[in-house]
From Swiss-Prot:
Binding site for Zn(2+): H570, H574, C672, H676
Protein known as: Alanine--tRNA ligase
Residues that span the membrane, as ranges: none
CDD domains, A to Z: AlaRS_core
Disulfide bond sites: none
Domain comment quoted from the record: Consists of three domains; the N-terminal catalytic domain, the editing domain and the C-terminal C-Ala domain. The editing domain removes incorrectly charged amino acids, while the C-Ala domain, along with tRNA(Ala), serves as a bridge to cooperatively bring together the editing and aminoacylation centers thus stimulating deacylation of misacylated tRNAs.
GO molecular function annotations of the record: alanine-tRNA ligase activity; aminoacyl-tRNA deacylase activity; ATP binding; tRNA binding; zinc ion binding
Organism, as annotated: Nitratidesulfovibrio vulgaris (strain ATCC 29579 / DSM 644 / CCUG 34227 / NCIMB 8303 / VKM B-1760 / Hildenborough)
Lineage: Bacteria, Pseudomonadati, Thermodesulfobacteriota, Desulfovibrionia, Desulfovibrionales
Details of cofactor binding: Binds 1 zinc ion per subunit.
Keywords carried by this UniProt record: Aminoacyl-tRNA synthetase, ATP-binding, Cytoplasm, Ligase, Metal-binding, Nucleotide-binding, Protein biosynthesis, RNA-binding, tRNA-binding, Zinc
EC number: 6.1.1.7
Family: Belongs to the class-II aminoacyl-tRNA synthetase family.
Name of one Pfam family that matches: DHHA1
Localization: Cytoplasm
Amino acid sequence: MITANEIRRRFLEFYKAHGHEAVRSSSLVPKDDPSLLFTNAGMVQFKKIFLGQEKRAYSRATTSQKCLRVGGKHNDLENVGRTARHHTFFEMLGNFSFGDYFKEDAIKFAWKFLTEELKLPKERLYATVFRDDDEAEQLWLKHSDIPAERIYRMGEKDNFWSMGDTGPCGPCSEILIDQGEHMTCGPDCGIGKCDCDRFLEIWNLVFMQYDQDATGKREPLPKPSIDTGMGLERITAVCQGVFSNFDTDIFQAIIQYTCGLANVSYRSDDETDTALRVIADHSRAIAFMITDGILPSNEGRGYVLRRLIRRAYRFGRLIGLTDTFLHKTALKVVDIMGDDYPELRENSDFMARVVREEEDRFNRTLDKGLSMLEDELATLSASGAAHVPGDIAFRLYDTFGFPLDIVNDIAEKRGFSVDEDGFKALMKEQKERAKAAWKGSGEKDIASRFQPLLEEGMRSEFIGYDHLCGEGRIVALMDEHALAVERLAAGQKGYLVTNRTPFYGASGGQSGDIGTIASPSGKVRVVDTIKPSPELVVHHVEAVEGDILLDQEVDLTVTEDDRVASARNHTCTHLLHAALRRVLGDHVKQAGSLVAPDRLRFDFTHIAPMTPEELAAVEREVNRVIMADIPLETDHMHYDDAVKRGAMALFGEKYGDEVRVVAIADESVELCGGTHLRATGQAGLFLIVSESGVAAGVRRIEALTGWNAMHAVLAQRSEQAQLSAMLKARPGEIVSRVESLQKENRTLRKDMERAAAQATSGQGRNIMDEATDVAGVKLLAAKVEVPNVKALRDLMDDVRSKLVSGIACLAAVDGDKVQLIIAVSKDLQTRFTAPQLIKDVAAEVGGSGGGRPDMAQAGGTNPAGIDAAFAKLRSLIGG
């Protein structure tokens, strides 16, 4: 039986033999496409090439791209595990032509690979073409053994592809395989008639031959291109003769491993099988997402990861996995796929720790959710309700990750039904809000703004590694809206491109240079420098003298102090990265950075806050290398050679075949295109000013170097002198003096709390006299004076200890706010619950609240409504 690994290998080798460059899979996080949450197709990393915004050294490529689809038109998460072919993570095999070959070779290659390499039976293969694509049909007849009756013409919905409303587009041709009559769904089964799995699409060939404008008009592209995609999981199922992707070797190793953990069998019952498939699928997604730098959080990509971890964990509970297990199944993914994706092995320890921590966190959350559901069911039972409202089910899902089926299961056992329609309506609202709120990854899509320049093939030669000034010619001039102009006059802002420039364009976390550009007729101040593509540098300018004209010869001068300050911070960023790995461990990976003239910021993967001792050790390490005054070496080499040398490739960065390596002896070797110092001693001083968390598993260090670090040290010295004077203590005595003051403060605070407790206890005895009888229920409703909410709760505890049977309501005013607490004795909870009562009572003071059946708390903003609130409570009890 051919394995998935063998299919992947054969595919890449086949296309390499036909002149294609085998390109590494890009990250699941699309670096240059802010419109996408995740990489969801093989063409994503080549999008700029198709759009004419980027050139590469090759014109044909092949990849096995890791992809993620978790919603929208591509995938409904709730279907994963329940169908044969829905997945979150998958691999897309693809071949691409960038103005090289077109339809004929694309069809020839595909047919040859399927029938000669994979040896699929020719008589079971079908093809579809776009309804107007006579050329594609003739090519299928010419280069394959598919007869005309097995070639179907389809409409635009099925067989026409576009990148968006405008841009490259074209017809496509799908290859399908007949899986046999036993898969027939009915008398109307057939291609274009149904969606069953008898005629299974295995490969899509996209022929990009048009450019569509905003009106929908399509013009032929000067260089048509090819984009194909074939899911590895699907073609593996076909080759292995199974009808579910989950029955392939890709998933079975994980499924059988999970069976061993849970002591269950696959193919025993639908519920168990679904759980095992979900765990296998999500384990793959989780392992790759964390490896690509995504960490659990409550928004964006991190929220998707958190949902997948929690969904898989819940399904584990359904098959008896009560302890944490998902970190183990994720490590199984590393065992299976680590040879083909080495980054999995490099990050396996950290990945497993992140999953384990998230499992532990969810375990605690689940217990809280179950408690909340029990409270809600008790309240509903007391009120005689038979249905769980949709908003309660949704709140449990949204807050605690409870799926509807778990709520249904628990509710059904207690005799309740669940308002599923209400739940689904709220889910729909949330999805629409999330869709509206998604503004992209936060990156500015600079390339699209300068699309015309890129399409013209405009390039800039960067000379700034060796020079801070130089001569060049203005080859493009634009106004502040990036529209082409002939001149910029004094006071006008705009953009300027020269054929040569010493200005560094913002990229790799480093800020763009500032400076001046002067011509014989005028001068502009460069306020920023941006880099829309690897070959193009654009100066954001403001004209300050005379006129600047298109096609003028100019002198370009970078502001030296800012460039050197940025170089200090960039070199120290490399030293910081290396020091963190030495002090904390090799799991540390860069998760983001900012290199500006005034500071550096470095985000990195690490579970826990750093201790003062660890921070001091990192600071010492960086300064040790600075004081050693080690020369920096830069070199250009092939990516594979750089990696063999030990150079670190940073998360989220895209690298070509030729890379620049920055080495600081044996201390640090990284792939980097930024500007650096000549030797580490030029950094002067490195000072960490803060360490904080920015997301689960991601820490941030902010630091200063050079003169900025020196100024900070002098400021700290001045502040220390002020503290010494205020505390009347010498510098070495400041800490002990503050400790003494804190001890004194704690003593005074305890004295105050003791006095407040004595006053509260006496108040509890006094207000018991205010209790009245309402419809046979003893009711105490009193307005009290307490210093804080804790004292109010303590007072209620005192009242409850004295109130054997009855209901108590205490109200306390704090400025323009009100706090209410209601308690219900156990014998009355079949008639009244505290959350049920406080909902209407709190409304009278402009508030709301909730709690347990025996006690609930609320806050309000209308102290004048307290009497009305007490009256409302009496009416509720009196019926």
